[in-house]
Swiss-Prot record:
This is Cyclic di-GMP phosphodiesterase PdeF. It is found in: Cell inner membrane. InterPro entries: Cyclic-di-GMP_PDE-like, EAL_dom, EAL_sf, GGDEF_dom, MASE1. It is an enzyme of class 3 (hydrolase). Induction: Induced by FNR. Expression is highest under anaerobic conditions at 28 degrees Celsius in stationary phase.
Length: 747
């Protein structure tokens, strides 16, 4: 361990690995370098030392210079002598310093990342391939011309612009193009052998997921066959496949590999293939009168093929990485950063059996309205983190829209685990700005088998069962609660929602009216809404208004009723010039800030006076914003409309609410009026309500006046208005034209 720690400490020093690596690697590269003889002298076909020195400089920076100088002297001193070796060393050092400096200047950040990064392609092509090859050739030509490298004059020839120079230049470009990544890989492996494991892991990630072992084996077999053909010596039995035609076949084969297997594998494999091919060039390029030209063309093929293969490998790898990232992001909610419903569907598909849990948090809605959406985001994140220790591999918490979450569990002992999860949930504490918040969590679950074809329908059923869990304070099994009944109930809701939308679009609603008579002989009507069925039967509001409220259609229905009532009043202005109508409002409409503006616009459109409208409001816990509701009602009163509190005395409407309410009329709930004759307690309650209403200067309306005894009792209490079957039954709105006068006379 001490030896390893010491090695790690000194390996990047100038007297460590940088000092000895060039001396060790240059002799090996000397056997890989390939030379050819042409009419004008000797030329390079492949040259690696420059790529090694560029890689050393890029990796070790200034610490690489002593080792590079030492490596050149050790390798060339005996062959060239002191002065030529010194000149050659100066050439290399000038080149690599300029390349390294330019690259660092134009790529200041992350300049040493592994090769294959598309963001650095242009800088690396220029500073690590084109610029050093060009400068090396210029300095080499100059040194040979002035006599500093007299022994190497045969490598450059007398004239600088000839085929030999072009071949040398292409060889340097090819050597740098495939040699710099290769040398960089060798340096990293020598510096840290464990890098091989990391490299192999990255290599596997870059391979296309659809690649099979059989495909890869066939590809390697084809590649080996082409290499074997290139390495076979020419003879009288040789075919076209023993010529450089086979070299051209390498391109489509390597292109396929580049698109399928990734840059990490192809860059190394192509380097080996190209070095073997170039080293065996004499086997497929015969010597004949056009030998130099053919060698030049083949050398350019090495360069073009290398660039195409490497560039295609980089692009294909980058494209696969982008696609994988997009696919990964598609399964994660971008706000809460938890797996989404798509990820849940995939997990249910991959597992043969699963236990699906649903967590419903209804109290979160009010907290979000008061503290903002960040509370919900952090609550879900921390709740997911709280549940993570109880989850097995492959299980997860999934984000659902709104305030709910889902869990997928393995089926082993899922009943006991769900009970444990519920106990763990009850121990969860969430703090927001130092305040503890613990909304109740309802838990429902079911046992499902892959594939789950109707995930959204299933989640809707679990949501319904989770509401029962909030009441029972225990996890609820959907199968025991009757899945078929829940499915039918949910389908009926969806069907009713569609019918409501059709009714709004095609005016399939029907308005009825019930008279309300006053003690002084005045009469107004309450508008009652019905919906036409498929066979023109009338559907009562109890069947569709709860669905309308749940799916957010109640406000649209209210506006439909108001507009069609005003339209009726405008069309019959002559027959009923001062008649009033009472219209029921849903809690959603009352909580909308723009509702008074819309009412004002409709009144102006149909030229109806505001005092002719009475809006009946039921005070209930469905009022999501009580303050806004009070502002809306105040604006309606300022507009000239009257406000009536409906169904007073039951549920949410109580004496405590009466203290703060500001209305014009108070409608006593029919449950008190119905028994006012037979139940003295109901009589006293009604009397107290009337007394309080008079103190608030409100008129009182009695509902459910169904017989003469009730009517006499109501009159004795001094109630201002009466409504019920004794006064008049609900009739189509159009019939009110014929009922107004008889009702007034009877009153």
């Amino acid at each position: 361990m001490k030896l390893n720690a010491t090695y790690i400490k000194i390996r990047d020093k100038w007297w460590g690995l940088p000092l000895f690596l060039p001396s060790l690697i240059l002799p090996i590269f000397a056997h890989i370098n390939t030379f050819a003889h042409i009419s004008s002298g000797e030329v390079f076909l492949f040259y690696l030392p420059l790529a090694l020195m560029i890689s050393m400089m890029m990796f070790f920076s200034w610490a690489a210079l002593p080792g590079i100088a030492l490596g050149i002297f050790v390798r060339k001193y005996a062959e060239l002598g002191f002065y030529e070796t010194l000149s050659l060393t100066a050439n290399f050092i000038i080149i690599i310093i300029l390349c390294w400096g330019g690259y660092r200047v134009f790529t200041p950040r992350r300049n040493n990342v592994s090769h294959g990064d598309t963001r650095l392609i242009s800088q690396r092509i220029f500073w690590q391939i084109v610029f050093p090859a060009t400068l090396f050739l210029i300095l080499f030509q100059f040194a040979a011309f002035v006599g500093l490298l007299a022994s190497r004059e045969n490598l450059v020839g007398v004239m600088p612009f000839n085929l030999g120079t072009l071949i040398n230049y292409q060889a340097l470009l090819v050597g740098n193009l495939i040699g710099v990544p290769l040398c960089y890989f060798i340096i990293r492996v020598v510096r840290n052998p464990f890098y091989l494991r990391s490299y192999y892991s990255q290599l596997k990630q870059q391979v296309d997921a659809k690649v099979t072992k059989k495909e890869f084996a066939l590809w390697l077999l084809a590649l080996g066959a082409l290499l074997l053909l290139l390495c076979m010596p020419l003879n009288e039995k040789s075919t076209i496949f023993s010529t450089n035609y086979t070299l051209s076949l390498l391109l489509p084969l390597m292109m396929w590999g580049a698109m399928r297997y990734g840059y990490k594998l192809i860059s190394l494999l192509w380097a080996v293939v190209l070095m073997i091919s170039i080293h065996s060039y004499q086997n497929y390029i015969p010597i004949y009168p056009g030998y130099t030209t053919q060698l030049t063309i083949t050398s350019s093929s090495y360069l073009v093929f290398s660039f195409i293969v490497n560039y295609m490998a980089v692009l294909a790898t980058r494209q696969r990485a982008v696609v994988r990232r997009i696919q990964r992001l598609a399964y994660v909610d971008p706000v809460v950063h938890l797996p989404n419903v798509r990820a849940l569907n995939r997990a249910l598909r991959d597992a043969p059996w699963s236990a699906l849990c649903y967590l419903r948090i209804p109290g979160m809605e009010m907290l979000v309205k008061n503290y903002g959406i960040m509370l919900r985001i952090q609550y879900k994140q921390k709740l997911s983190h709280w549940l993570s220790p109880l989850l097995e591999p492959g299980e997860d918490v999934y984000q659902l829209s709104g305030n709910d979450l889902a869990l997928r569990l393995n089926t082993e002992s899922h009943q006991e685990r769900i009970t444990a999860l519920d106990s763990h949930l009850k121990q969860f504490r969430f703090f927001w700005d130092g305040m503890p918040m613990q909304p109740q969590i309802g838990v429902s679950y079911c046992y499902v088998r892959s594939p789950v074809n109707h995930i959204y329908l299933l989640l809707g059923e679990l949501n319904t069962v989770a509401e029962l869990s909030i009441v029972t304070n225990a996890p609820e099994n959907m199968q025991r609660r009757g899945a078929m009944y829940l499915q039918r109930e949910l389908k009926d809701k969806v069907a009713m929602m569609n019918r409501l939308q059709q009714a709004l679009e095609h005016n399939h609603f029907f308005l009825m009216a019930q008279p309300i008579t006053g003690m002084r002989g005045d009469v107004y009507h309450e508008i009652l809404l019905r919906m036409k069925g498929e066979n023109d039967e009338l559907i009562s509001p109890d069947s569709f208004l709860p669905v309308a409220h749940e799916f957010g259609l109640s406000s649209s229905i209210d506006m439909w009723v108001i507009e069609h009532t005003l339209q009726f009043m405008a069309e019959n202005r002559a027959k009923m010039p001062a008649h009033r109508f009472a219209i029921n409002l849903s809690p959603t409409s009352v909580c909308q800030a723009r509702f008074p503006v819309e009412v004002s616009q409709l009144l102006a459109k149909y030229q109806i006076e505001a005092w002719q409208l009475i809006f009946e409001v039921t005070e209930s816990n469905a009022l999501t914003n009580v303050k806004q509701a009070q502002i809306t009602l105040q604006h309606l009163q300022e507009l000239g409309c009257q406000i009536a509190i409906d169904d007073f005395g039951t549920g949410y409407a109580s004496y405590a609410r009466l203290k703060n309410v500001n209305a014009d009329l108070l409608k006593i709930d029919g449950s008190f009026i119905r028994n006012i004759v037979s139940n003295s307690l109901d009589y006293q309650i009604v009397a107290s309500i009337c007394h309080l209403a008079r103190m608030k200067k409100m008129l009182v309306v009695a509902e459910y006046v169904e017989n003469e005894e009730i009517r006499e009792a109501v009159l004795s209490l001094g109630i201002d208005y009466m409504q019920g079957y004794l006064i008049g039954k609900p009739q189509p709105l159009i019939d009110t034209l014929n009922e107004i006068e008889p009702i007034r006379e009877s009153a």
